[in-house]
Amino acid sequence: MTIIAISIMNVVIGIAILGVILRKKIMPNQKFQRIFILGVQGILIVLSGIMLIGCEGTDIINRISPYINMVTVYSNNVNINIGYSIDGISAIFIFLTIILILSCNLISIRVIKEKTEQKFQIMLLLTEILIINFFAATDLVQLYIVYEATLIPMVIMIGVWGSRTEKKIAAFQILIYTLIGSIFMLMSIGILYSTLGTTDYIMIREYIDVLPENVRKLIFIGFFIGFAVKIPIAPLHLWLLRAHVEAPTAGSVLLAGILLKLGGYGYIRYNIGLFPDLCEYYFPIIGGICLISILYTGIATLTQLDVKRIVAYSSISHMNVIVLGLFSGVLQGIEGGIILMIGHGVVSGGLFLCIGVIYDRCKTRIVYAYNNLVHVMPIMAILFFLLVLGNIAFPITSNFVGELLIFIGLIKKNIIIAFFSALSMIVTAIYSFWLYNRIFFVNEIIKREANEVISSKGQIVADMNALFLIEDVMKKKEERGIDDIGQPKEVKKEQLIYSDVNIFEFTSISLMVIMMIIIGMKPSVVEGFIAINCLELISK
């Protein structure tokens, strides 16, 4: 049933893409097209729910195992088997992908211009079908092709719908970084095919131990570097910062919410799944690199002014904590890493949704330009606060469960690495609450600029509310001739919108908050799908 569901998903998304392309003939009304797209996402959610039910308590290791609840269908082409297999881990990531795409559809209704909305929806659907096929792939060549193809719609989204002047540079940078990393991944696949004569994942798992130790190490390093770019691990993280700053809201949500998880999923399948002994061997090196990344990005976050860069650095820090958990080789660490990947997907995705809404209203992302928005956007203030709690791993949130399990696993593995990685929680709490306070409450820098404005107007204003401050502080920014990243920019008064979230924005952000709380309050919802897989990873 699970493979039938994945096949139907591909057909449904294909029909949706065709429907969007032919919308002028089939759906001349823009409203009907949006209803059609949302209906497609609803069908996909139902199908992914069926997969989740069918995959609970399954693994991908042995096709004829009584624990397997799947069917694998192959078509042979040049000795490369192309097929699909779904287990608990891949099913839950597919579900996350569909939820995030739905949120992107909802958040883009207002901000994407009508004349380009058709092309934008096609890019979202292409991203969705490629990511779903990545998580369901059983062949390494199939996986590599889909892995690379996910770049195409993302590069187009950033290059065409990006919000800044350097969007084309960002699109080129993400392309170059990922392609260079993929060379190492392709090298590992080539070695596997030349030595074992197959690229089928199940067959490789069965015979991987017969390879010489040096060959196995070379394959391991190739996969590690290839997926490290996507995580990303410092110093391979530079592409992500520019990509987030330049990307449209939906692009940032997909980058943080699911595309970074391709690297984590790759580690689970092709590093930990194939070489658990080498994970143990290289853990001190991997742990040291991740610790440097965690501490560096945490401290760097405190120096940022662009709110997107703040969340981007936070995202890198969390992903490196995930890598520590996955490579710990301890059951709790691996389970925590997977749960935190899901939690990070909804929390960071939700934060980027919030930032996109605020940017749509205020036309700036520089943190000092915001002040007292709680009076103008009270609902947004509540949603943002809940997501901040998730970002700092507050109890009853998904990130709390994931980080707790990771640190339990790290304590069992290496107490020193566990101690220093735990410092990231303190740093995360500092910049998360600092960011929230800067956006929604009064800060001293804005007070000084506001007082200058008040003095120049000769007015006495007791309540320096957000409506007044956004307009006049932005005028002062215009006088100084700077924008979010130090480049000339003109912000017109008529561009500013003073309103809280609309129904589409509220729904998209609420989906993230609800998933975060459900996983946090009942982690067994996720553990039921991944437990057998994690046990298998540590027992190989």
UniProtKB/Swiss-Prot annotation:
Disulfide bonds: none annotated. GO terms for molecular function: NADH dehydrogenase (ubiquinone) activity; ubiquinone binding. One of its GO terms (biological process) is electron transport coupled proton transport. Its main location: mitochondrion. It catalyses: a ubiquinone + NADH + 5 H(+)(in) = a ubiquinol + NAD(+) + 4 H(+)(out). Coiled coil: none annotated. It is a multi-pass membrane protein. Its EC number is 7.1.1.2. GO terms for cellular component: mitochondrial membrane; respiratory chain complex I. Keywords: Electron transport, Membrane, Mitochondrion, NAD, Respiratory chain, Translocase, Transmembrane, Transmembrane helix, Transport, Ubiquinone. It is found in: Mitochondrion membrane. The chain crosses the membrane at residues 2-22, 35-55, 89-109, 118-138, 140-160, 172-192, 218-238, 248-268, 282-302, 310-330, 338-358, 376-396, 415-435, 501-521. Core subunit of the mitochondrial membrane respiratory chain NADH dehydrogenase (Complex I) that is believed to belong to the minimal assembly required for catalysis. Complex I functions in the transfer of electrons from NADH to the respiratory chain. The immediate electron acceptor for the enzyme is believed to be ubiquinone. Belongs to the complex I subunit 4 family. This is NADH-ubiquinone oxidoreductase chain 4. It comes from Dictyostelium discoideum. The lineage of its organism: Eukaryota, Amoebozoa, Evosea, Eumycetozoa, Dictyostelia.
